[in-house]
C-alpha cells in the first residue's frame, strides 16, 4: 500500500460505482495521477482493480475494465509488469468463460486484442500475444480493432540513481550532507543543488516535489512562457484606436518645468516642517521618558481616508509662510553646511541612491538632489539607542509581519503621492495648494527615519549572519582537522596494536622455541638415563654370567657327590607306596643358579653337610662318579601277592604304566627284599612332557668315567625335555616302579602310569634290585 491508499480506494469505488450512467473520467484520471506520482503502488492498484473486475455486478466489472484500460495506457511500465503476466491473462480467460454479460465479454476481448497489439514488440510481455493467439484458435470472436486504440503514450518518472557524491557540485555525502533525488531526472543531489520544489505535469505529478536546479529552470521556463502569453494585452485593446496612439509622454515646455520646480520646493518646505515637528516631539519624549521607544507608524502616518481629503483651513496658514521658508531653502551654503555636519555625525544614514526613488516625483533632474539631502541633517539630533530598538524588538519576538506592513504602507504612500502629483501636473494645478500632497509628503517624511532604522537593522543582521557563516566555516574546518587528527590517532593506535601483536607473536615464537629446546633436552636426558639403565642391566647380566661361569668352574674343580640327590628324599606313606615328588623342593643351605632346573647336577651344589645315607646301598669307594651316570637305587620289590593298580586309576596317558615283575639281580648290589621297610631316597626329576626311557633290567657295566666339564654340560637340563633326541631310548630297558609292601599294614600301590610293554628281554624272576639311569 502507499500513502494515498485511502484516496485511491475512494476514487476506485467512485469510478466503478454501479449507480453510474456513464464512465467517470475525472475519477479515473485522478487514479492514474495517484499511480504515476507514486502515492499508490502499481501492484496494490492492479490487485484492487482485479477485485472490482471479478465483481458479480456486470456494471461494476465493466467500469473496472475501463479503469484498467486507462491505467495501462497512462501509468507506464510498472502497471504493464503487473497486468501483462500469465496470472492476469489466466484470470481474464476464466472471467470470460463464466461471464454471461455481452458488454463485459466484448470488453475483455477488446482489451486482450489491444494489449497484444501494443506489446507485440516486447519479449517480456509475450504472454499477452500467446493468450490472444490461443483464444483465436479456441474460436473467440474479437471485435473490430483500430490501431489508435493500442497507442500508449505514458511517460513515467525515471528511476532514482544512487551515488556517493552530488551529481552537480560533486560534494561527498556524509552525516551532514544528505542525499536528495530529483523527481524529474532521477539524479542524486545535495541539499543546496536540489532546494527547489515544482510540479511535473508530464509525469502526472500535480503536487510540488523536490527537483534540481536545471530541471526547475526548465519546468518554470515553460510555465513563464505560458504565463507571458496569457498576460498579453487583450484583443479588444489591440483592435481599438487607442492602441494606435503613441505611448510616449508628451514633451514638456518651460511652463511644465517651472511647475515641477515649484513642486519640488513645496516638498522641501513640507519636509522641513515635518522634521521640525518630529524634533520637538522627540525632545519632549526624551525628557519625560529617556529610554522610550519611538512612536509607532500608525501615530505618525495619517489614516487612509485623510490622504485624499482636502482641508482648506489647514493648508491656509502654511501658504502664508511660503516666502521666508522659500528664501531659506534657496540658500545653498546652508544646505552644504548641513551635509558636512551629517557626514561628521556618528549616526549611520541610508545611502543617497536608496532614497531617490521614494522621493523622486517625476522626471526632474535638479530637484531630487535637494530633496534627498533634506532629511540628512535631521539625523544628527537622533540618539543611537533608538536605532537599535527595532532590531532588539525583532530579536525579542517581533515578527516580520510588522516590517512587511510598514513597507507596504510606505509603498502605498509613495505610489499615491506620485500619482497625485502626476494628476496635478496633468490638470495644471499647483501642488502647493494641494493639501493631500502635503499630508502624503508629511507621512512619507515621518516614515523615513524608520526606514533608515530598518536598513540599519538589516545591515546589522547581515553582518551578524556573515559572522555566523564565518564561525560555521571555522567550525567546519575545525571539524575537518579534528576528524583528520582522529583518523591519524586511530591509525597510530592500529599501528601500535599491530606492533604489539607482532611483538607478542615474536615472544610466543621465542618461548615456543625455548620450550622445544627444553623438550629436546628433556628427551635427550631421558634417553641417556634409559641407555644408562640398559648398560647397568647389561652389566648385571654380565656379572650373573660371570658368577655362573665361576660356579661352573668351581663345580668342575670339586669332586662329584656319590649321591647327587641324597637330600631329595620322599617319605613313604602309611601303605608303603613311594610317590614321585610333583614339584621342586627347596632345601636349606642350597644354591640354585638362574636357569638351573631342579634335579640337575648344578642344583644343590652348595648344600650343607650331606646327611648320612640311610639307604641300604653304600657308596662306591675311591672312585670318581661319571656325571652322565646317576646313582641307581635298589627298590625293594613288593609282596608276592601285590598286584598292579587297575588302569582306571592311571594318571596321564603319556606316562608309562606300572608293571610288576621280578628284577634280575645285578652284580655288586645286594637284595633288600627281606629288610624292613624304610625311607628310600626319592628321585626328583624335572617335569617332562614325553615318555622317559628308563634303564632296563639288563646288566650294565659300572665303569665310571672321569668327572669333566664336557660331561657336566651334557648333563645340564638346559635342553628342551620335549625333544626325544635328548632322551635316548635303550633297547631292552624296562621301566620299573617298585611296589613296596611294608611289614605292617595292608599292601598299597603306587599310582599306576601307562607304560608300554617291554620289547626286549624276558622278565626277571625273584625279588631283586634294578638299576635305573636318568639322563
UniProtKB/Swiss-Prot annotation:
Q: What is its main location?
A: cytoplasm
Q: What is the effect of changing residue 215 to S?
A: Accumulation in proteinaceous aggregates devoid of membranes and no interaction with PI3P
Q: Which GO terms describe its biological process?
A: protein transport
Q: According to the UniProt entry, where is the signal peptide? A: none
Query: Per the database entry, which stretches of residues form a coiled coil?
Result: none
List, for all copies, the residue spans of the domain called VHS.
15-143
Q: Which CDD domains does this one have?
A: FYVE_Hrs, GAT_Hrs, VHS_Hrs
Q: Does the keyword Transport apply?
A: yes
Q: In which tissues is it expressed?
A: Ubiquitous expression in adult and fetal tissues with higher expression in testis.
Q: Which GO terms describe its cellular component?
A: cytoplasm; early endosome membrane; multivesicular body membrane
Superkingdom, natural source: Eukaryota
**InterPro entries from the UniProt entry:** ENTH_VHS (IPR008942), HGS/VPS27 (IPR017073), HRS_helical (IPR024641), UIM_dom (IPR003903), VHS_dom (IPR002014), Znf_FYVE (IPR000306), Znf_FYVE-rel (IPR017455), Znf_FYVE_PHD (IPR011011)
Q: Which residues carry this modification: Phosphotyrosine?
A: 216, 308, 329, 334
Where does this one sit in the cell? Cytoplasm; Early endosome membrane; Endosome, Multivesicular body membrane
Question: Which molecular-function annotation in GO is an example for this chain?
Answer: identical protein binding
**Segments of this protein annotated with the region Interaction with SNAP25 and TRAK2:** 443-541
User: What keywords would UniProt list here?
Assistant: Acetylation, Cytoplasm, Endosome, Membrane, Metal-binding, Phosphoprotein, Protein transport, Transport, Ubl conjugation, Zinc, Zinc-finger
Cite the binding residues for Zn(2+) 1.
Answer: 166, 169, 190, 193
Q: Does the keyword Cytoplasm apply?
A: yes
The region called Interaction with STAM is annotated at 452-570
Pfam families, per the entry:
FYVE (PF01363), Hrs_helical (PF12210), VHS (PF00790)
**Domain description:** Has a double-sided UIM that can bind 2 ubiquitin molecules, one on each side of the helix.
Q: What does this protein do?
A: Involved in intracellular signal transduction mediated by cytokines and growth factors. When associated with STAM, it suppresses DNA signaling upon stimulation by IL-2 and GM-CSF. Could be a direct effector of PI3-kinase in vesicular pathway via early endosomes and may regulate trafficking to early and late endosomes by recruiting clathrin. May concentrate ubiquitinated receptors within clathrin-coated regions. Involved in down-regulation of receptor tyrosine kinase via multivesicular body (MVBs) when complexed with STAM (ESCRT-0 complex).
Its name, as the record gives it, is Hepatocyte growth factor-regulated tyrosine kinase substrate
Amino acid at each position: 500500500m502507499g500513502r494515498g491508499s485511502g484516496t485511491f480506494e475512494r476514487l476506485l469505488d467512485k469510478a466503478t460505482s454501479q449507480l453510474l450512467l456513464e464512465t467517470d473520467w475525472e475519477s479515473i484520471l485522478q487514479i492514474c495521477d495517484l499511480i504515476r506520482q507514486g502515492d499508490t503502488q502499481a501492484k496494490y492498484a492492479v490487485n484492487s482493480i482485479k477485485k472490482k473486475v471479478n465483481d458479480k455486478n456486470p456494471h461494476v466489472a465493466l467500469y473496472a475494465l475501463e479503469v484498467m484500460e486507462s491505467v495501462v495506457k497512462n501509468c507506464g511500465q510498472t502497471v504493464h509488469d503487473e497486468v501483462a503476466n500469465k496470472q492476469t491473462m489466466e484470470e481474464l480467460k476464466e472471467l470470460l468463460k463464466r461471464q454471461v454479460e455481452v458488454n463485459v465479454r466484448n470488453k475483455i476481448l477488446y482489451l486482450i486484442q489491444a494489449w497484444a497489439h501494443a506489446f507485440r514488440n516486447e519479449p517480456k510481455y509475450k504472454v499477452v500475444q500467446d493468450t490472444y493467439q490461443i483464444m483465436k484458435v479456441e474460436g473467440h470472436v474479437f471485435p473490430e480493432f483500430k490501431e489508435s486504440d493500442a497507442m500508449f503514450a505514458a511517460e513515467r518518472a525515471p528511476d532514482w540513481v544512487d551515488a556517493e557524491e552530488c551529481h552537480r557540485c560533486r560534494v561527498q555525502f556524509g552525516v551532514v550532507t544528505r542525499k536528495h533525488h530529483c523527481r524529474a531526472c532521477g539524479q542524486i543531489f545535495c541539499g543546496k543543488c536540489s532546494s527547489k520544489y515544482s510540479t511535473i505535469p508530464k509525469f502526472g505529478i500535480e503536487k510540488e516535489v523536490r527537483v534540481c536546479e536545471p530541471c526547475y529552470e526548465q519546468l518554470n521556463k515553460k510555465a513563464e512562457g505560458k504565463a507571458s502569453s496569457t498576460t498579453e494585452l487583450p484583443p479588444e485593446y489591440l483592435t481599438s484606436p487607442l492602441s494606435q496612439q503613441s505611448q510616449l509622454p508628451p514633451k514638456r515646455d518651460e511652463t511644465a518645468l517651472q511647475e515641477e520646480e515649484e513642486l519640488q520646493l513645496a516638498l522641501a518646505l513640507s519636509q522641513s516642517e515635518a522634521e521640525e515637528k518630529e524634533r520637538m516631539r522627540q525632545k519632549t519624549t526624551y525628557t519625560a521618558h529617556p529610554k522610550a521607544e519611538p512612536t509607532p507608524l500608525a501615530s505618525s502616518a495619517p489614516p487612509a481616508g485623510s490622504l485624499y481629503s482636502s482641508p482648506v483651513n489647514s493648508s491656509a496658514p502654511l501658504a502664508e509662510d511660503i516666502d521666508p521658508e522659500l528664501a531659506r531653502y534657496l540658500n545653498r551654503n546652508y544646505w552644504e553646511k548641513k551635509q558636512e555636519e551629517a557626514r561628521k555625525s556618528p549616526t549611520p544614514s541610508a545611502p543617497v541612491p536608496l532614497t531617490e526613488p521614494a522621493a523622486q516625483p517625476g522626471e526632474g533632474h535638479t530637484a531630487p538632489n535637494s530633496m534627498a539631502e533634506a532629511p540628512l541633517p535631521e539625523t544628527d539630533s537622533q540618539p543611537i539607542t533608538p536605532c537599535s530598538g527595532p532590531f532588539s524588538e525583532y530579536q525579542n519576538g517581533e515578527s516580520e509581519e510588522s516590517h512587511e506592513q510598514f513597507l507596504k504602507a510606505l509603498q502605498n504612500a509613495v505610489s499615491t503621492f506620485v500619482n497625485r502629483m502626476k494628476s496635478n501636473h496633468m490638470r495644471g494645478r499647483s501642488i502647493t495648494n494641494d493639501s493631500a500632497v502635503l499630508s502624503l509628503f508629511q507621512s512619507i517624511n515621518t516614515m523615513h527615519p524608520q526606514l533608515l532604522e530598518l536598513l540599519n537593522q538589516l545591515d546589522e543582521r547581515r553582518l551578524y549572519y556573515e559572522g555566523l557563516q564565518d564561525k560555521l566555516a571555522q567550525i567546519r574546518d575545525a571539524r575537518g582537522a579534528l576528524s583528520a587528527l582522529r583518523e591519524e590517532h586511530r591509525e597510530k593506535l592500529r599501528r601500535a596494536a599491530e606492533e604489539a601483536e607482532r611483538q607478542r607473536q615474536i615472544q610466543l615464537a621465542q618461548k615456543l622455541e625455548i620450550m622445544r629446546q627444553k623438550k629436546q633436552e628433556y628427551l635427550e636426558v631421558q634417553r641417556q638415563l634409559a641407555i644408562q639403565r640398559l648398560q647397568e642391566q647389561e652389566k648385571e647380566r654380565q656379572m650373573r654370567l660371570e658368577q655362573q661361569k665361576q660356579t661352573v668352574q668351581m663345580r668342575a674343580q670339586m669332586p662329584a657327590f656319590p649321591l647327587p640327590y641324597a637330600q631329595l628324599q620322599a617319605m613313604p606313606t602309611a601303605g608303603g607306596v613311594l610317590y614321585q615328588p610333583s614339584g621342586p623342593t627347596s632345601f636349606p643351605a642350597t644354591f640354585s643358579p638362574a636357569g638351573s632346573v631342579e634335579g640337575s647336577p648344578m642344583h644343590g651344589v652348595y648344600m650343607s653337610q650331606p646327611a648320612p645315607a640311610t639307604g641300604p646301598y653304600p657308596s662306591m669307594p675311591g672312585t670318581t662318579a661319571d656325571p652322565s651316570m646317576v646313582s641307581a637305587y635298589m627298590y625293594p620289590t613288593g609282596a608276592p601277592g601285590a598286584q598292579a593298580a587297575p588302569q582306571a586309576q592311571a594318571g596321564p596317558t603319556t606316562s608309562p604304566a606300572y608293571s610288576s615283575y621280578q628284577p634280575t639281580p645285578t652284580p655288586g648290589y645286594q637284595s633288600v627284599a627281606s629288610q624292613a621297610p624304610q625311607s628310600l631316597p626319592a628321585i626328583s626329576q624335572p617335569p617332562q612332557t614325553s615318555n622317559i626311557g628308563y634303564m632296563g633290567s639288563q646288566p650294565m657295566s659300572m665303569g665310571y668315567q672321569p668327572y669333566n666339564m664336557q660331561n657336566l654340560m651334557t648333563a645340564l637340563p638346559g635342553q628342551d625335555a620335549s625333544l626325544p633326541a635328548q632322551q635316548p631310548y635303550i633297547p631292552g630297558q624296562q621301566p620299573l616302579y617298585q611296589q613296596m609292601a611294608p611289614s605292617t599294614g595292608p599292601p598299597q600301590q603306587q599310582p599306576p602310569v601307562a607304560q608300554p610293554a617291554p620289547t626286549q628281554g624276558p622278565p626277571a624272576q625273584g625279588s631283586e634290585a634294578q638299576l635305573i639311569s636318568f639322563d
